[in-house]
Amino acid sequence: MKRGLLIFLLSGIFHLVNGQNIEKYHSRYMHPFGALTLTGGVGIAYYMGDLRDGVSSHPGLGPSVSVGALYRLTEHFSARGEIRFYQVAADQKYSKKFNNNLSFRTRNPDLNLGIQADVFAYNRHKKVNPYFLAGVGVTYMTPKAEIDGNWESLAPLQTEGIKYNRLPLVFMAGIGLSSKIAERWSIGMELCNNFVNSDYLDDVSDVYPDFSTLSSDLARRLSDRSSEVGLPPQQPGWHRGRPNRKDMYMFLQVRVNYLIGTRKEAHERKNVRCP
């Protein structure tokens, strides 16, 4: 009896709130749950890690591209998922730690799931809507370095004598702004910082290894490149990176969104088009 009464009361509250929303937004109200939006973005990626030493003449910028979708959960919250591709790079030749002379370039995919929180409700139909985002994903790291005119993959060489995980978790957080330009189209800007659960995005983390344990002459040459700038070789145990700081990369993108909507909205549009 009590259980039935509780269900009845909760159902009544839900319909009351839903009815107030409909009255608030009048004929333009659409229940937000299930509204689907396709997203795309293009912009720049910026690297922050062991080979960055303040602002230098080598900014470490590269391109970034993303495609994904938003699935509306409530008036303010959406689940989001994306696949992204990015390139970042750095070269110590242009930094205060030029004596190490290490460099890298990586072109990586990443996949993530998260939550987006819009400042204005879905049914407010605001032309401009700021939002916040947070999520988690994975990235596949493919660091390379150029030597003798060739780009060599660094991870298989184990330049620090360590075999590291090339598919680490990535935690993301960011802000954005979306501006409606048509009934179903919007454009905007998004800034997203990506915290990698690894210090090997750039293949540099800890100390110089015992070079005799490395697998090849190529591995030894790419582990210690000081001689290329006329400096004496590094010694095992000397600092090569900063193991207490994990790597990050940041995206600044122009975004384009297309609202598909819910099944109910699609059905209503179909009825409007029919004579």
What function would you assign to each model-found segment?
Residues G34, P59-P63, R107-L111, V128, ...:
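Residues that define the transmembrane beta-barrel architecture of outer-membrane proteins
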Residues G40-I44, V67-Y71, L113-A117, A134-V138, ...:
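Residues on the lipid-exposed face of transmembrane beta-strands in outer-membrane beta-barrel proteins
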Residues F77, E82-G149:
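Gram-negative (and chloroplast) outer-membrane scaffold detector with strong preference
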